[in-house]
């Protein structure tokens, strides 16, 4: 198979981008797709999900329950659920705030 070669007036071979009638593209949008606050919350809750249940387990098994791993494990599982529920609640509130902001902008346009 052959490809079409574009030869300019000066005799040099051109690419499709060189002869594009639309011209060079404008500046691109390089803003992140996800806001930094969302990433910060996710990283914070990830850290809490890792450290809080493990820390709770070892603290309670050694100092509170006197070696009873069953109670310490149950409390660690409860703490993991607390972190998860807190993250879900915060995500819902953040989403509701964005929806309220979009509604305010829609009212301004009317």
Curated annotation (Swiss-Prot):
A GO term from the CC aspect: endoplasmic reticulum membrane
Question: Per UniProt, what is the membrane topology?
Answer: Multi-pass membrane protein
Q: Where is this motif: Prevents secretion from ER?
A: 107-110
Q: What disulfide bonds does the UniProt entry report for this chain?
A: none
The residues on the Cytoplasmic side of the membrane are: 1-44, 93-110
Lumenal side of membrane: 66-71
Domain of life where this protein originates: Eukaryota
* Disordered as annotated region, ranges: 1-28
Keywords, sorted A to Z = Cytoplasmic vesicle, Endoplasmic reticulum, Membrane, Transmembrane, Transmembrane helix
Where does this protein have compositionally biased stretches of type Basic and acidic residues? Answer: 11-21
Q: Mention any Pfam family matching this sequence.
A: VMA21
Endoplasmic reticulum among keywords: yes
**Keyword Membrane on this protein?**
yes
Signal sequence region:
none
Where is it localised?
Endoplasmic reticulum membrane; Endoplasmic reticulum-Golgi intermediate compartment membrane; Cytoplasmic vesicle, COPII-coated vesicle membrane
Q: Name one GO biological process term.
A: vacuolar proton-transporting V-type ATPase complex assembly
Q: Where are the transmembrane segments?
A: 45-65, 72-92
Biological function: Required for the assembly of the V0 complex of the vacuolar ATPase (V-ATPase) in the endoplasmic reticulum.
UniProt similarity note: Belongs to the VMA21 family.
Task: Output the HAMAP family linked to this UniProt entry.
Answer: VMA21
Recorded protein name is Vacuolar ATPase assembly integral membrane protein VMA21
Give the originating organism: Phaeosphaeria nodorum (strain SN15 / ATCC MYA-4574 / FGSC 10173) (Glume blotch fungus)
